[in-house]
Amino acid sequence: MMLENKAFEPRPAHSAPTVDKMALTGVNFYYGDAHAIRDVTLSFPERQVSALIGPSGCGKSTLLRILNRIYMLYPKMRATGSVTLDGQNILDPGYSMNELRARVGMVFQKPVPFPMSIYDNIAYGIRHHERISKAEMDVRVEQALRSAALWDEVKDKLKGSGLGLSGGQQQRLCIARAVALRPEVLLLDEPTSALDPISTAKVEELVARLKTDFTIVIVTHNMQQASRISDNTAFMYLGELVEYGPTAEIFQSPKVKRTEDYITGRYG
């Protein structure tokens, strides 16, 4: 089934052998009695970008929050099934939450810098997990800011408040804060939805660079963005996984009509 809509130019399908970093098997999620995610099985290849797409309320962000168990901060929410990280089930009650937070970082839709200096925004998480010298901390802070393509813009005002940065800079600061802990997986929940086009382009370029070191899962409503930056795409609808595969295949020759209808704008 070839689409007539040629507006998208997806990244070419990944041809190299892949290793799954995270894998979901038979995952269900409940908000109280409401069944929000239904029997989802899919995997996220190591050091690739996987995009979650679908209409509002389809379960994309909920699925993302299962991957680091952040839902446990709220009452009456529960997940069943298996979510493995390097073969270990992170839904196991005995799995260390501190270890999970260090291994799986997250950046939210709206930039949320801490009300402290730029330097301390980066150092905060490191101090919580590690004991290192001031000199080592200085290096880690610089490395994180460079990783987020922010160092040159803030190196002379590290003691200034992170809240004083522009929206795009704040989002890159949040990305720097996440990567400072050297996680293995980075979760991005619509990280550019509140940004202007120039800031969005910077974040997209950043994602392309970061995947050399991290496995990235991104939620986006922007079809062009998904086609530009992801290696794999999962289409969700009403809490179910409809289709998942290499981005080029999903956008150029989807196997399910509902997927085609969504990415060509027939509903959304």
UniProtKB/Swiss-Prot annotation:
Keyword Translocase applies? yes
Per the record, what are the reactions this protein catalyses? phosphate(out) + ATP + H2O = ADP + 2 phosphate(in) + H(+)
Q: Which organism is it from?
A: Rhizobium johnstonii (strain DSM 114642 / LMG 32736 / 3841)
Source species taxonomy: Bacteria, Pseudomonadati, Pseudomonadota, Alphaproteobacteria, Hyphomicrobiales
Q: What is this protein called?
A: Phosphate import ATP-binding protein PstB 2
Q: What family does the Swiss-Prot or TrEMBL record give for this protein?
A: Belongs to the ABC transporter superfamily. Phosphate importer (TC 3.A.1.7) family.
EC assignment: the record states: 7.3.2.1
Gene that produces this protein: pstB2
Q: Does the keyword Cell membrane apply?
A: yes
A GO biological process this protein is involved in? Answer: phosphate ion transmembrane transport
